[in-house]
Swiss-Prot record:
Its EC number is 2.1.1.-. It is found in: Nucleus; Cytoplasm. It comes from Danio rerio. This is Protein-lysine N-methyltransferase SMYD4. GO terms for biological process: determination of heart left/right asymmetry; heart development; heart looping; heart morphogenesis; methylation. GO terms for molecular function: histone deacetylase activity; histone deacetylase binding; histone H3K4 methyltransferase activity; zinc ion binding. SUPFAM superfamilies: HIT/MYND zinc finger-like, SET domain, TPR-like. Its main location: nucleus. Disruption phenotype: Mutants generated by CRISPR-Cas9-mediated gene editing exhibit severe cardiac malformations, including defects in left-right patterning and looping and hypoplastic ventricles.
């Protein structure tokens, strides 16, 4: 939920509508962010704070012993049927809802330790045993914990012997060491020009797959999935991102440590818990429900300001006010890290690397936001600022720290709210979705589906400098948690900072060339609308609406020229004539057979209706598969396959989805050869849609290698692995799970053949 909840939006819209015309006009003319914030501050009253409090009741983050007990009991039910992963998730939610140092907390920890033990996670089990005892686990039950503790220690001692693997080989992400990030590779430089702003060029040839940039998120905020269930204070069955990922470093974990004050925030270990508390959570915690109500962007904007502190913000304000715009050169100028920043009023012609100034200097696009949108953001931040004043000011924002003097909110601290408003405006164009591949767990199928989902929203100071293309020459991947980087892939140059661990976010983006880049070429990133997934008009509409620019990338120019009134009819990709099977030509009103002797025509509406019908059949079949009703699903998929073949060629995206679903179904029944044959058919459609060097094709080849491996066809699996590895290596870290599994399969098969 990036934006505020609808109830709060409606309240602010009503407040906007009630303004007198002269007030509306006065606000609409304001372009200075401080003035916009102060105007919003002047309009709020205690009732606004009360209304937000009432709205946020449905997002309650209060501890609840009753809810903790419910989750523990649900965990017990999962434990009894040996569904240990689900048991751990239930126990973790119980841990988060239980009060500090209570029997309920100790019981949740103890039960979770048992579920972790049966998954072979012995180190994590020992940690939970320690936590349970520290929370006051009943003395008459401690024999069970001591027995489990001894068993864990024995297993870990066995694993220390050579050639004896064990499953608990990883440290908590919090315990891992970190290399500095936020740097460009050798041969990459930041430039500025009046038409492109800041952008990046490669100064030497870069082959596809080479890392060109690594950047660390300044801050990130998880996107909650179960936000509307939190207010019921009742245990719910499903688990969202907030239940699976550390709220500081975003790493996946099973054994979370909770915030001692609220039921929402949880961390992969005590280190992340402390770092988050020190940097922002001790001030976010009392207004946690309000932050869930105002949405991820408002929450992230506040978090950036809390982390930066008054000194950093004042430095940003002073530097921008001390300079006037003198930059008039139209030719690109190379920028050096921390170089002369006196050329522009807003520092948009400077390169600040990974520092806070890298965030502060991003354009807020004040004039491009509609007056109503500016009003919503201003009132929202003014009310949150008012809520924060219910507690002590953040340490980094206190005007004085004289011993014996009680800290209080000073008038000049309003810059906290104004700067948060600045960042909220910036995030409209500069927020970056953090994605992860998640396996769907609700299904009882032997073979489960996976999909890429958004788990968080972050802001990256260096990544934000990349310009957009609908057909980019880079791909990005994310790393979460504080992990070592033994590969040291980058020859570090500009933008290299050494941060103490406590100030780091643990969330890193790696940008790789997805195509061969030649010296002087601009590094381009896709903001979301991609040519392979969206028509040009829709892409341009979305980019103008959210990012305030008319895209003129090469892909858009090519697509627009093909669709111009002067352009000739062109072949409709993936479409064929229902009468003769020849390719269809698309035109303004519909489609015509390309074979002159046939000339059959079909309207666009008819085509859309057919495609929607195919999609409904596929959705129904997938639903049946998830219920393990495989025969019914197969009947529907075969019907959809027959109907689709009458009008769609093998390269149409729907044919790829259909073939993938059939492959999953046959894999569920152990018919590996049939599954592989259908998955091969999906490769044609995926390559046509995404390209022969795409990550999508690489992942599909990875699945094909798995099917051949499971079907004991080692020769076929070994023939697929090299191509899958090459494509995945273009887009992913060498440590990604897919590449590691490919190596394990290859090693196993080579030992057998």
């Amino acid at each position: 939920m990036d934006l505020p909840c609808q109830d709060w939006v409606c309240h602010v819209e009503q407040k906007w509508a009630e303004l007198r015309s002269e007030e509306t006009e006065r606000f609409s003319l304001l372009t200075d962010i401080d003035a916009i914030f102060n105007y919003g501050l002047s309009l709020i009253c205690p009732e606004d704070l009360n209304i937000l409090s009432r709205i946020s009741e449905k997002f309650s983050v209060k501890k609840s012993p009753e809810t903790a007990s419910e989750f523990r009991q649900q965990g017990n039910l999962s434990f009894k049927v040996k569904d240990y992963p689900a048991a751990v998730l239930h126990y973790s939610k119980g841990v988060c809802h239980a009060d500090k140092n209570t029997d309920e907390l100790s019981l949740c920890y103890a039960n979770r330790s048992a579920a972790l033990f049966y998954q072979g996670l012995y180190q994590a089990c020992l940690e939970d045993i320690r936590r349970s005892l520290e929370a006051g686990y009943p003395s008459h039950l401690q024999d069970k914990l001591q027995t489990r503790q001894t068993a864990c220690q024995n297993q870990l001692r066995k694993a220390e012997k050579p050639n004896i693997p064990h499953t608990d080989h990883q440290l908590s992400p919090c315990q891992k060491t970190v290399n500095s990030t936020g740097h460009l590779s050798d041969g990459v430089s930041v430039y500025f020009s009046s038409d492109k702003g800041r952008h990046m060029l490669v100064m030497e040839n870069k082959p596809a797959g080479e890392v060109v940039l690594e950047d660390e998120a300044y801050c990130s905020v998880l996107i909650p999935a179960n936000i509307f269930n939190t207010g019921t204070n009742k245990a719910v069955e499903t688990f969202g991102t907030e239940d699976r990922h550390c709220h500081h470093c975003l790493s996946q974990s099973l054994s979370f440590v909770p915030c001692p004050k609220c039921s929402y925030a949880r961390y992969c270990g005590e280190s992340c818990q402390k770092d988050a508390w020190d940097q922002w959570h001790q001030w976010e915690c009392p207004v946690g429900a309000d932050l869930l109500a105002i949405g991820v962007l408002g929450h992230l904007a506040l978090r950036v300001v809390l982390k930066a502190g008054q000194t950093e913000v004042q430095m940003g304000i002073k530097n921008t006010k001390d300079h006037v715009t003198t930059y008039k050169n139209d030719s690109p100028v190379q920028l050096s890290l921390g170089g002369d920043c006196g050329k522009s009023l807003d520092h948009t012609d400077c390169f600040h690397g990974s520092s806070y100034m890298g965030i502060y200097s991003l354009l807020p696009h004040v004039a491009q936001h509609s007056p109503a949108s500016r009003f919503l953001m201003a009132i929202t931040m003014a009310v949150i600022y008012g809520k924060l004043q219910g507690g002590p000011p953040p340490n980094k924002w206190m005007s004085f720290k004289d011993e014996g003097v009680k800290a209080s909110w000073q008038p000049e601290m309003s810059m906290l709210g104004a700067t948060a408003l600045r960042h909220m405006m910036q995030l409209r164009c500069n927020a970056q979705a953090i994605t992860a591949v998640r396996v769907k767990e609700e299904s009882g199928m032997a073979v489960q589906s996976s999909s890429e989902i958004r788990i968080a929203t972050a802001i990256f100071p260096v990544l934000s400098l990349l310009n957009h293309s609908c057909s980019p020459n880079t791909s990005i991947s994310f790393t979460t948690g504080f992990q070592p980087d033994p590969h040291n892939q980058l020859g570090c140059s500009e933008g290299h900072f050494d941060h103490p661990k406590g100030s780091r976010s643990g969330v890193t983006v790696t940008v790789r060339a997805s195509k061969d880049l030649t010296a002087g070429q601009e590094i381009l990133h896709c903001y979301g609308p991609h040519r392979s997934r969206m028509e040009v008009k829709e892409r341009q509409r979305l980019l103008l609406e959210q990012y305030f620019f008319q895209c003129v990338c090469q892909a858009c120019q090519r697509d627009l020229s093909e669709g111009s009134p002067n352009a000739k009819e062109h072949t409709a990709p993936g479409m064929k004539c229902v009468k003769c099977g020849k390719p269809l030509q698309s035109h303004t009103d519909g489609y015509t057979c390309s074979w002159s002797s046939c000339g059959h025509q079909i309207s666009s509406a008819d085509v859309q209706n057919r495609l929607q019908g195919f999609q409904l059949l596929l959705d129904e079949a997938v639903h049946l598969m998830e219920q393990d009703r495989l025969n019914e699903a197969l009947h529907i998929l075969q019907s959809a396959f027959s109907q689709a073949n009458s009008i769609l060629t093998e390269t149409h995206p729907f044919q790829g989805e259909l073939a993938d679903a059939l492959a999953r179904l046959y894999a569920s029944t152990g018919e590996w050869s049939l599954a592989a044959s259908h998955l091969k058919r999906s490769l044609v459609a995926i390559q046509a849609q995404f390209g022969e060097d795409s990550i999508e094709l690489g992942r599909q080849l990875f699945k094909l290698a798995q099917l051949h491996f499971n079907g004991r066809d080692g020769v076929a699996s070994l023939s697929v692995i090299p191509r899958a590895r090459r494509l995945l290596s273009l887009h992913c870290s060498p440590r990604c799970e897919e590449l590691q599994e490919l190596s394990e399969m290859e090693h196993c098969l080579q030992g057998l053949l």
